[in-house]
């Protein structure tokens, strides 16, 4: 048997360090066993998937030094490697299950399903949708003939226990009563993750599924689908989730999660990959610094610890410092520095702003220094010139951060539209609103267009600086944060409603 592993990211946002973490362990497992590592794009969420995000993911993983044997950009015997290009095949598999009596057509509206969930909740039952939605055959035929919108759901046992076998965790028992009748095919004909994932893993001959522990509760559905189709199931291995220093799940609301952020911060790809390799795993000799080749040579999946590995930027910076001092000659250091700081693509975006303000070339460094920094050395006094009360100032930064977290198309036009809409909704003059934004992003209220800077810096660096500015100001209290979340939800809903009209 040839070992075949895969990583299957969704192109719906910035390339996440969690994706790189799982990709690294899949790659090491495959290479250590002389197998193949496959990259597949899971773009079944057509509303959120973008080609830009896909390219960002591929570029970021390659920047780290991860290479795949098959994928959308390199091809392979199981092409295509984008689920959107395979969508015509999924309906046949879903209907095969209907014909076998393992799935059924569901015509319930979202409103009807909400009522059912509330009724189950009131009865003290799990809110998941169970099999009582199935209709008599004659009614199904009538509704299908009438062209009524429908989905296809899988059937799930009402009682009993499912035993999931895991390489790291042994037997995991999950009550079937907790498992809902998962939608397999959506009303638009696109498969859900669960159907597409199982079908593609089978067709691509995946032997080992190494993924995050957040998928444990989905494992019973996947086991059932393999059973229903009569296919051999891959071996499962659920990796521990990356955590923030406070042990909560790693998320962009608390820490930068984009690989692009760490590249812009000036972290070496070798160091970031090394750090991800230490997330829940260690070398046999406990050495902290190692290359990808060394990790592959010594890799044993059984050495993974199930304790939540903490992704700590302070420790990453320390490790990166070791790499810079111990692995780069002075010439190599200079080459990397020049490539990082003055690569044409990045620098070209700043030239119009710098050239129009500079009188000598020596003016360039002070004018553009904030564009070549990570976190800025700002202090509370830097916001002293603001005309806003302290709590209102914090809300401006907090609401801007939350609003921009939802921005999927990172352009200066969209950034400005978001900030302008917030300014209006909060009844704060645009100039007063933008002042703390300028300080947070540029370190001073006197800089070139801050939205241009935000576009160039990228979403993760922008959000990191806004988050850091809030920390400098002391942030909102727990009580204040709860009230702010409620107020922001109302403001955001009003803005969205206005934009639709």
Swiss-Prot record:
CC terms in the record's Gene Ontology section: cytosol
Residue interval(s) of motif 'HIGH' region: 9-19
Protein residues bound to ATP: 252
PROSITE patterns, A to Z: AA_TRNA_LIGASE_I
'KMSKS' region (motif): residue ranges: 249-253
Compartment(s) where it occurs, according to its Swiss-Prot or TrEMBL record: Cytoplasm
Family membership noted in the UniProt record: Belongs to the class-I aminoacyl-tRNA synthetase family. Glutamate--tRNA ligase type 1 subfamily.
Assembly description: Monomer.
Reported function: Catalyzes the attachment of glutamate to tRNA(Glu) in a two-step reaction: glutamate is first activated by ATP to form Glu-AMP and then transferred to the acceptor end of tRNA(Glu).
Protein name: Glutamate--tRNA ligase
Organism annotation: Hahella chejuensis (strain KCTC 2396)
């Amino acid at each position: 048997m040839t070992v075949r592993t895969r990583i299957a990211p969704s192109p719906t946002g910035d390339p996440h360090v969690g994706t790189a973490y799982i990709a690294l362990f899949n790659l090491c497992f495959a290479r250590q066993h002389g197998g193949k590592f496959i990259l597949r794009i899971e773009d079944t969420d057509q509303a959120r998937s973008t080609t830009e995000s896909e390219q960002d993911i591929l570029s970021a993983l390659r920047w780290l030094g991860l290479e795949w044997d098959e994928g959308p950009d390199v091809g392979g015997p199981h092409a295509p490697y984008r689920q959107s290009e395979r969508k015509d095949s999924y309906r046949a598999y879903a209907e095969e299950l209907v014909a076998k009596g393992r799935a059924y057509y569901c015509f319930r509206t979202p409103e009807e399903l909400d009522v059912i969930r509330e009724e189950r909740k009131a009865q003290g039952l799990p809110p998941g949708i169970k099999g009582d939605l199935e209709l008599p055959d004659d009614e199904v035929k009538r509704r299908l003939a009438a062209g009524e919108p429908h989905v296809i759901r899988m059937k799930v046992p009402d009682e009993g226990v499912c035993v999931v076998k895991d390489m790291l965790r042994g037997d995991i028992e999950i009550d079937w009563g907790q498992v809902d009748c998962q939608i397999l095919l959506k009303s638009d004909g696109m498969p859900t993750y669960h159907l597409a994932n199982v079908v593609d893993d089978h067709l691509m001959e995946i032997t080992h599924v190494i993924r995050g522990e957040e998928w444990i509760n989905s494992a019973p559905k996947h086991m059932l689908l393999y059973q229903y189709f009569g296919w051999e199931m891959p071996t499962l291995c659920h990796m521990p989730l990356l955590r923030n220093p406070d042990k909560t799940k790693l998320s962009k609301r608390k820490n930068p999660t984009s690989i692009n952020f760490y590249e812009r911060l000036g972290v070496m790809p070798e160091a970031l990959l090394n750090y991800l390799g230490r997330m829940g795993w260690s070398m046999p000799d406990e050495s902290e610094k190692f290359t990808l080749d060394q990790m592959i040579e010594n890799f044993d999946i059984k050495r993974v610890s199930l304790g939540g590995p903490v992704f700590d930027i302070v420790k990453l910076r320390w490790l990166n410092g070791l790499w810079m001092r111990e692995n780069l000659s002075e010439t190599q250091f200079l080459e990397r520095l020049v490539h990082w700081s003055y690569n044409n693509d990045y620098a070209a975006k700043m030239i119009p702003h710098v050239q129009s303000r500079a009188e000598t070339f020596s003016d360039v460094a002070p004018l553009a220094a904030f564009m070549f920094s990570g976190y800025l050395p700002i202090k509370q006094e830097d916001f002293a010139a603001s005309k806003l009360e302290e709590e209102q100032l914090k809300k401006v930064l907090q609401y801007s951060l939350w609003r921009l977290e939802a921005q999927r198309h990172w352009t200066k036009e969209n950034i400005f539209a978001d900030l302008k809409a917030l300014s209006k909704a909060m009844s704060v003059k645009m100039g007063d609103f933008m002042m703390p934004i300028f300080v947070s992003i540029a370190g001073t209220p006197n800089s070139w267009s801050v939205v241009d800077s935000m576009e160039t810096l990228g979403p993760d660096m922008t959000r990191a600086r806004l988050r850091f500015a809030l920390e400098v100001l002391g942030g909102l209290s727990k009580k204040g944060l709860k009230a702010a979340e409620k107020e922001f939800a109302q403001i955001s809903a009003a803005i969205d409603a206005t934009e639709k009209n």
